[in-house]
A protein has these predicted regions:
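C-terminal regions of RecA-like/P-loop NTPase motor modules
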Residues: 1-18, 28, 33, 45-55, ...
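Conserved Walker B
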Residues: 24
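A short, small/polar-residue-rich loop/turn motif at beta-strand boundaries
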Residues: 33-36, 40
Length: 148
């Protein structure tokens, strides 16, 4: 995996505190597997091994399937992770961002987002409400925004 050698080099030259992978499904596996689910499983396992080798967290962003669009409650679930159940299995933590306002223009929760902690190997799961600041495309602490 080319990424592993780059990370090793960066760690030796500068140190490394965290690795961020923007869009896991754009990566390709080393085996040239024709089955995309198996390939994503291989990638997921190699990311887990990379985190252990580099002794740092790896944050990997993943695309969801279209399943949330088909449900009345559009909140994403673990089963919505695209192309592989191994992402769900291998990850220590899985979090989703959700804004009801995106799907429901009449919502009472305008300017509110949710961080859904769907899996946390060493802790609780649940939902944390946050302020959505659309002008800056960012989330913020709900208490801080509403007290300012």
């Amino acid at each position: 995996m080319e990424m592993r050698s780059k990370c090793r080099k960066i760690k030796m030259e500068h140190g490394i505190d965290m690795i961020l992978i923007d869009y896991l499904q754009l990566m390709s596996g080393s085996s040239g597997n024709d089955n995309r689910q198996q390939e994503v499983s291989e990638i997921s396992r190699s990311i887990k091994a990379l985190a252990k080798e580099m002794e740092c967290p790896v944050i990997a962003l993943s695309q969801l399937s279209r399943a949330p669009e088909q449900r009345a409650d559009h909140r994403p679930m673990l089963s919505d992770l695209r192309e592989s159940g191994s992402i769900e299995q291998d990850a220590d933590v899985v979090m989703f961002l959700y804004r009801d306002e995106y799907y429901n223009k009449e919502t009472e929760e305008k300017g509110i987002g949710e961080c859904i902690i769907a899996k946390q190997r060493n802790g609780p799961v649940g939902t944390v409400k946050m302020a959505w600041i659309g002008a800056h495309s960012k989330f913020a602490d709900l208490d801080l925004v509403h007290t300012e």
